[in-house]
Amino acid sequence: MSYAQTKTQTKSGYKAGVQDYRLTYYTPDYTPKDTDILAAFRVTPQPGVPFEEAAAAVAAESSTGTWTTVWTDLLTDLDRYKGRCYDIEPVPGEDNQFIAYIAYPLDLFEEGSITNVLTSIVGNVFGFKALRALRLEDIRFPVAYIKTFQGPPHGIQVERDKLNKYGRPLLGCTIKPKLGLSAKNYGRAVYECLRGGLDFTKDDENINSAPFQRWRDRFLFVSDAISKAQAETGEIKGHYLNVTAPTCEEMLKRAEYAKELNQPIIMHDYLTAGFTANTTLARWCRDNGVLLHIHRAMHAVIDRQKNHGIHFRVLAKALRLSGGDHIHTGTVVGKLEGERGITMGFVDLLRENYVEQDKSRGIYFTQDWASLPGVMAVASGGIHVWHMPALVEIFGDDSVLQFGGGTLGHPWGNAPGATANRVALEACVQARNEGRNLAREGNDVIREAAKWSPELAVACELWKEIKFEFEAMDTV
């Protein structure tokens, strides 16, 4: 081996030392099976470590391998259970990086457990000393494994049927300020936004239960606000009540209370709470007919660095299996990170039933979801009325467009802010349906609508120069 390795000779003549992983776990002649879980890792080895050895080490440490020979290897069939690096390809423009393709036998994983999959595939291997950095770029779940999951509690079509809303994106808003409002004032803000034309309002991800606003009080005032807004508008409304809690028992207690109040949707922070809690809640939502909105708080800690961590497309696939009806995906045009091709790659992986391999969009494997329900993409973060044409053109109908500051920042108040967004949305949808090109004519569509909507005209004037123009870090 070409990197530092020590071996010791015992009195019995047995040689112990660091494994040469290439001999066992690098198998370029292997053809992956339809039942294998496949993973694509971006590997940056330490200087002097051959690519094949580094790739084999990843396969070993994320499956059956350990650092030395152990006699209990003889008690099982390692050739049946080991992970295998079956291909290596260079990363364009990077001399010391490569993509390692690894196949894992399905029998290594517990059925219906994303927790177990991630514990195995992205567990200890990320701290391996032979690697300078490691990133899981993509994963392929076989149909045989997908069939062991419930997936989203309801899915896109069932949600539209519940809400009786078709043919357009849904509109939402995160209530601001995110922290500090009393439950009564919070409910007032919810009512004004829903009355003005939004479909949903939302708890911020870090609102759980605090001294200034206990969860039960918030649920009550929000429920009253929704009932009043529905009576005035004749539309079904909802608010993402965040049931994330310190324990699973408390989480389910809050979910049950939301159900008692006849609320159509609740919310969960799936990464900070964990996949076990999320899968538990998703199953409860299916059993109780409640929609589940998912926030991805903490995702950038895991996926922001290009060379190390887990790409969000993997976290998105994991969420579709664990369960959620909505998930935040970035906006492409707003304040949060997200390049268009990459973002739409994982949006397709959330919504579509079958997605072909397309490495230009970061999709390393063809993914067949075996008719598992889709997840609605949520675009949220630094967006306003001038972004509406681009959002409709990029995300299409099966999405939720959430304007927090872009609603509550309206000079005339929350309800006019909501009205401005609803007018802008319906103008863009109508223009698209008439065959107009929103990418080219979007600003004209907004200006035309503003002529007969004073709420939209004021919003257009306020945010006409607000842009977030930074180079995306998430590129292929």
UniProtKB/Swiss-Prot annotation:
The record marks 335 as: Transition state stabilizer. The keyword Membrane does not apply. GO terms for biological process: photorespiration; reductive pentose-phosphate cycle. The modification N6-carboxylysine is found at residue 202. The keyword S-adenosyl-L-methionine does not apply. It comes from the Bacteria. Its EC number is 4.1.1.39. The active site is at 176 (proton acceptor), 295 (proton acceptor). One of its GO terms (molecular function) is magnesium ion binding. It is found in: Carboxysome. Mg(2+) binds at residues 202, 204-205. It catalyses: 2 (2R)-3-phosphoglycerate + 2 H(+) = D-ribulose 1,5-bisphosphate + CO2 + H2O; D-ribulose 1,5-bisphosphate + O2 = 2-phosphoglycolate + (2R)-3-phosphoglycerate + 2 H(+). Its cofactor is Mg(2+). The disulfide bond which can form in the large chain dimeric partners within the hexadecamer appears to be associated with oxidative stress and protein turnover. Signal peptide: none annotated. Heterohexadecamer of 8 large chains and 8 small chains; disulfide-linked. The disulfide link is formed within the large subunit homodimers. RuBisCO catalyzes two reactions: the carboxylation of D-ribulose 1,5-bisphosphate, the primary event in carbon dioxide fixation, as well as the oxidative fragmentation of the pentose substrate in the photorespiration process. Both reactions occur simultaneously and in competition at the same active site. NCBIfam families: PRK04208.1 (NF003252). Belongs to the RuBisCO large chain family. Type I subfamily. This is Ribulose bisphosphate carboxylase large chain. It comes from Trichormus variabilis (strain ATCC 29413 / PCC 7937). The lineage of its organism: Bacteria, Bacillati, Cyanobacteriota, Cyanophyceae, Nostocales. The gene is cbbL.
